[in-house]
Structures are given as structure tokens and as C-alpha cells.
Curated annotation (Swiss-Prot):
Protein biosynthesis as UniProt keyword: yes
UniProt-annotated stretches for the region Catalytic: 252-543
GO MF, one annotated term: threonine-tRNA ligase activity
Domain TGS residue range list: 9-72
Name of the featured protein: Threonine--tRNA ligase
Source species: Geobacter sulfurreducens (strain ATCC 51573 / DSM 12127 / PCA)
Catalytic activity line of the entry: tRNA(Thr) + L-threonine + ATP = L-threonyl-tRNA(Thr) + AMP + diphosphate + H(+)
Annotated GO CC locations: cytosol
Residues noted as binding Zn(2+) in the record, renumbered to the chain: C344, H395, H520
EC number: 6.1.1.3
Compartment list: Cytoplasm
Length: 645
């Protein structure tokens, strides 16, 4: 439609584009018409739009005075729309191939999409290939996608007549009197949208895996068949993502944990409980020792609390009312106890054990505390989601005037630690929700301290309005690994609840009792989870200071065993974590095994090394260091490790 430069006439509408320019179109014009008025290329590329910030289909009519944005597959919002529409395409293919399948929900998620189906027989990998092939046929058919609005009663009748009882259940729970549906050929689905104009816009997709999922996430409900997939704007982006997925499979911490003999799980022990093998336990110990050193450097006091505490204490803290479904309980001599799911309460007791003065503050209590949480079996995942884990928990108790400096100190701590491990990270501030406790002054002070620390950090951050806990605002810190995946690790959480519930006080300069400000914080979070992330980040190739085994002594033949044994003892007694392989095997075989175990250095002992009293360190990538005395290698290792100790 042509642009009018003289202004609107009766029946025209005026809309504003993101750059501030205006367009005048005839009344009843749609998002697609607006795109066409700008250019034929944009009209062809348009997949959806935004009217006053609300996403709509390209067929949505424009309103006078609206601010309008055209969404293409290159837009920030475009990928989610592509993925959501591709989930509908998958559901259509499933219904054609498996007519008795019942459809449930199929949202876009961070890495793609999924759809849950109620099927008589779980899908096989061969079924997955058939579904994907049918999706390609439907995409090539260029089937228009059309939006339809029905009353709730009409929609219930439609889906009930189709035998789609899950959709009926969803609709009946909706508060709206009308609902929107999307049709593409013989398939119809309940959805708010928006969606692609036609199936031909689904150009690059792949079904990736099968899984089970309970309806509404409730184990009491029926197990459904979940199909995962992903979609992108073009094949190049899809191929790059699929290669990343293959690399992630090679780095899977569960796979490497077995291959490197770090840890295991056993049905005899129970799901979600890790058994640490010698090398895994050493890795964990190194990490925990690192944590203790770093905390002591920064003025934290190391404390240790018991594993079980009286049920009355959990009732007093509020955990019993709000968290007991995730707790384990036991009884001792008729007295109820709760196994701790977090470490806060012992720290409260330490604070209350004596009268505190403002001169004592800030107090920083740090504990590598093992906790137990009842996680559903369906969400357990290697080290990343377990039922027993250790957290690097700390609680800072300070005066209101000290809060700013304490928050900045924690962010500086996080920055230092993430730098040591080579992680980039993102920060998010979650602010006061509608339902909260604490005064306006408390919230303003705490939020201001968190926000000020974020600004002073010089790093980008996001604000999640209203997403804080009811008892205080927080900063969440998410690290990015070598595959650009995000992982939640550090948290800085202000808490107005526990100091009140436990009547924590200090005496100020005027002799009056005041309530301290409390900050919960973790740096690495769950040690188990962080180790899982480390394994995948480094692909098992841990840096020298963190490697459970730093070197292995290899003999070429049996003749070198006496000298090789001396080398081994020299390294071991001087603190190098060393193994030996004196087996009567070919050297190439032993080197290959050491490389598969990802040991940083191999010390090959042949006749030349015996004669010269040296070792020739070979790095795991195949490169060699110059020959050196065993004592020189010890010094080399210690110098490398000292940088992190």
C-alpha cells in the first residue's frame, strides 16, 4: 500500500514503526499489509508482528495510533515463533501417522521445542525418523496456518468430539470466555499464538530425542511420550547447533565420569546419591580445599552444623510449612528431626550463641554443608540434579550501613573465582514480588545495594521485575561453559525473614538492640553440580592444579622398573599426584590409555632416561617438554599449582 505524505483521510489509520517513522494505511490493514507497504522483500520475510508490544500473526488488523514492529526469522522474537510452529507441525505429523495419539502441550523452549503425546506404545527411533520425514512433506505442502476464535463451550465441544480430552481439561481450566485455535490442514490445536503464516516457513528442523513425562509434571498422572526437537531459521544455523549437540554428547559428564572412574550411581544405594571413587573424591577434595582457602582470604569463618535438627526448629524457620515436601524426616527417641535441606539454621544458632555488638559485624559464616533434598526421580540427572549434595553456603550478618560493601565483596569474589575456572557469566537482579514481607525501607535498601553492586561491577545485567523471593531481592549468576550453555551457580540473596523469626539482634553504638541484615550466598553452589559442569566444560581435561592424577610414570620395558620406581616415589613424596604403569605392554598402548584417562603428563622412562637420571614429560596433547631431573619436574608442577593455591 502506498504511503500518504499529506496525512490520513477518513478511514485511514496511522501507525508508528520502531525507528519512529509513521505509516498511513487504509482501515482494516494487517501486519502483512504494513510489511508490503515498506517493501516486497519484507512482506515475504514477515512471519509475525508486534502491536503495542504484543505479538500477533501477520493477518492481525492494525489499530490507529499503534506502535508496530514486523517480526522476521532474523528478529529476536522470531526463533521462538519458528520453534512453536514447528512443534505444531510435529503434532500434525504424529496425528497423521498415529491417529489414536492424544495431543497435550507443545511449547517452544530454550533449545528448541517439545510435544507430549498420550500413545498406546512408546515411540521408537524408527518412529522418530518417520515423524520427521512426514514433517518435511507437510512443510513442502505450504499449508496455510489460520487463527480461529471460539467460545470456551464451542472449543470444549470441538475437542471432545475429536477425542482430545487433554485439550478439554486445559480449556475448562481457563478463565477466559473465548479461546484461540490454530488450524493447518487437517490439524487443529489450542494455542494463543502467534504462528508462522504457513508450514513452508518451517525450513530447518530436527527431532532430537524421546523421553517420558508425566501429565502436568505430576507422578500420580499418566506417563506421556515426549518428543524433543529443535528448529532454526536456516540449515546453516541448524547444522551448527547439531554439531554442538554431538560435542555435548562427547562431553557428557555421566559418560566421562564412568570412563575416567570418577563416580558412579547404584540402584542398591538409591537414585540421586553419588558414590565418589578415589579420583572423583580427590577432585572434590581439591575443589573444597580451594574454596576454604579463598573464603579464609576474604575474612569468612568456617563453621560446621549437624545433619539433622529438631522439627520444631524447621517449623520456626518456616521451612516446615513451605518446604517439607522436599525434606526427609526421622525420629530419635520419640523426638522428630528434619534432615537439613539447607545450612541456614545452624548459622542462626551460632549467631544467637552470644550477645553481638555492632563492633563484631560483619560476621561471615561459611560452611561446605552436605544437604539432602527429596527430588522427584524424573528430574534426577547425573551430578546436575541429585538428592544429596554439598553447598558452599555462607551467611553474612551485617549492619544496614555495611550491606553495600558486603554485596560488592561477594560479586568481586564471584568474578575472581569464575576467572580462575575460565567461565564467562551473566547476572540477573530479581526484585520485590507482589506478596512479600519486610518494610518498604528494607526492600529499597537491599535492592539498592544489589543494584549498586551490579552497576559498579561494570558487567551487563538484567532486571527481573517482581521475580524475587518473598523474603528479599536476589542476584542470580549464570556461568557460560565452552559450549555456550548457561548454568545457574552463584546466588546472592537478601533475607528479611530469618533474622526476624530467630530474633537476631546486635547492640548499636547507642546501646540499643537492632536487627542485622542477612545475606545468603553461594559461589559455586552445589559442589556436585559444579563438578558436573567442570567435567563437561573441560571435556575431562582438567587443568593441572585440579587434575586428580597429575602425572603417570611409564616404562618402555621391565629393565627400567627400578629407576622408574625411584621416580615415582620422588614425585609422590613431594606432593605430585602420580600413578605408575609398569606393565609388560607396548609403550604405545600405555600412552594411549593415559591419554584416554586425560592425565596431564606422562613420564616415559627408557634406557636413555635411566642413564641420564632424567625424565621426559609428555603432555596429554602429544607435545614434549625438555628432559629434566625428577626434582625439576616436581618444581615445575608445584610452580603451576601455586598460582591457584
Amino acid at each position: 500500500m502506498p504511503l500518504s505524505v499529506k496525512g490520513p483521510v477518513m478511514g485511514d489509520i496511522r501507525v508508528t514503526l520502531p525507528d519512529g517513522s509513521e505509516r498511513i494505511l487504509a482501515e482494516g490493514a494487517t501486519v502483512r499489509d504494513l510489511a508490503a507497504s515498506i517493501g516486497a522483500g519484507l512482506a515475504k520475510a514477515a512471519i509475525a508482528g508486534k502491536i503495542d508490544g504484543v505479538q500477533v500473526d501477520v493477518t492481525a488488523p492494525l489499530t490507529d495510533g499503534a506502535r508496530v514492529e514486523i517480526i522476521t526469522d532474523k528478529s529476536a522474537d522470531g526463533l521462538d515463533i519458528i520453534r512453536h510452529s514447528t512443534s505444531h507441525l510435529m503434532a500434525q505429523a504424529v496425528k497423521q501417522l498415529f491417529p489414536t495419539a492424544k495431543v497435550t502441550i507443545g511449547p517452544a523452549v530454550e533449545t528448541g521445542f517439545y510435544y507430549d503425546f498420550d500413545v498406546e506404545t512408546p515411540f521408537s527411533p524408527e518412529d522418530l525418523a518417520r515423524i520427521e520425514e512426514r514433517m518435511r512433506e507437510l512443510a513442502k505442502a505450504d499449508i496455510p496456518v489460520e487463527r480461529q476464535v471460539l467460545s470456551r463451550d464451542e472449543a470444549v465441544k470441538l475437542f471432545r468430539d475429536m477425542g482430545e480430552e487433554y485439550k478439554v481439561e486445559i480449556i475448562e481450566a481457563l478463565p477466559e470466555e473465548s479461546v484461540s485455535l490454530y488450524r493447518q490442514g487437517d490439524f487443529v490445536d489450542l494455542c494463543r499464538g502467534p504462528h508462522l503464516p504457513s508450514t513452508s516457513f518451517c525450513r530447518a528442523f530436527k527431532l532430537t530425542s524421546l523421553a517420558g513425562a508425566y501429565w502436568r509434571g505430576d507422578e500420580k498422572n499418566k506417563m506421556l511420550q515426549r518428543v524433543y526437537g529443535t528448529a532454526f531459521a536456516d540449515k546453516k544455523e541448524l547444522d551448527a547447533y547439531l554439531e554442538k549437540i554431538e560435542e555435548a554428547k562427547r562431553r557428557d559428564h555421566r559418560k566421562l565420569g564412568r570412563e575416567l572412574d570418577l563416580f558412579s550411581f547404584s540402584d542398591d544405594v538409591g537414585a540421586g546419591f553419588v558414590i565418589w571413587h578415589p579420583k572423583g573424591a580427590m577432585l572434590r577434595t581439591l575443589l573444597e580445599d580451594f574454596e576454604r582457602r579463598e573464603h579464609l582470604k576474604r575474612g569468612y569463618d568456617i563453621v560446621v552444623g549437624p545433619q539433622i535438627l529438631k522439627t520444631e526448629l524447621w517449623q520456626r524457620s518456616g521451612h516446615y510449612d513451605n518446604y517439607r515436601e522436599n525434606m526427609y524426616f526421622t525420629e530419635v527417641e520419640g523426638q522428630g528431626f528434619g534432615i537439613k535441606p539447607m545450612n541456614c539454621l545452624s548459622h542462626m544458632m551460632i549467631y544467637k550463641s552470644q550477645l553481638r555488638s555492632y563492633r563484631d559485624l560483619p560476621l561471615r559464616f561459611f560452611e561446605l554443608g552436605t544437604v539432602h533434598r527429596h527430588e522427584r526421580a524424573g528430574v534426577l540427572h547425573g551430578l546436575l540434579r541429585v538428592r544429596c549434595f554439598t553447598q558452599d553456603d555462607a551467611h553474612i550478618l551485617c549492619t544496614p550501613e555495611q550491606l553495600d560493601a558486603e554485596i560488592k565483596g561477594v560479586i568481586s569474589f564471584v568474578n575472581d573465582v569464575m576467572g580462575i575456572f575460565g567461565f564467562d557469566y551473566e547476572m540477573e537482579l530479581s526484585t520485590r514480588p507482589e506478596k512479600s514481607i519486610g518494610s518498604d525501607e528494607d526492600w529499597e535498601r537491599a535492592t539498592g545495594a544489589l543494584l549498586g553492586a551490579l552497576k559498579d561491577s561494570g558487567r551487563p545485567y538484567e532486571i527481573n521485575e517482581g521475580d524475587g523471593a518473598f523474603y528479599g531481592p536476589k542476584i542470580d549468576i549464570k556461568l557460560r561453559d565452552s559450549l555456550d550453555r548457561k548454568w545457574q551457580c552463584a546466588t546472592i540473596q537478601c533475607d528479611f525473614t530469618l533474622p526476624e523469626r530467630f530474633d537476631l539482634t546486635y547492640v548499636d553504638a547507642d546501646g540499643e538492640r537492632k536487627r542485622p541484615v542477612m545475606v545468603h550466598r553461594v559461589i559455586l553452589g552445589s559442589i556436585e553440580r559444579f563438578i558436573g559442569v567442570l567435567i563437561e566444560h573441560f571435556a575431562g581435561n582438567f587443568p593441572l592444579w585440579l587434575s586428580p592424577v597429575q602425572a603417570i610414570v611409564l616404562t618402555v620395558t621391565d629393565n627400567q622398573q627400578p629407576y622408574a620406581a625411584q621416580v615415582f616415589e620422588t614425585l609422590r613424596t613431594n606432593g605430585v599426584r602420580v600413578q605408575k604403569d609398569f606393565r609388560n605392554e607396548k609403550l604405545g598402548f600405555k600412552i594411549r590409555e593415559a591419554q584416554l584417562q586425560k592425565i596431564p603428563y606422562m613420564l616415559v622412562i627408557g634406557d636413555k632416561e635411566v642413564e641420564s637420571g632424567t625424565v621426559t614429560p609428555r603432555f596429554r596433547d602429544g607435545s614434549n617438554l625438555a628432559a629434566m631431573k625428577p626434582e625439576e619436574f616436581v618444581a615445575f608442577v608445584n610452580d603451576e599449582v601455586k598460582r591457584f593455591n
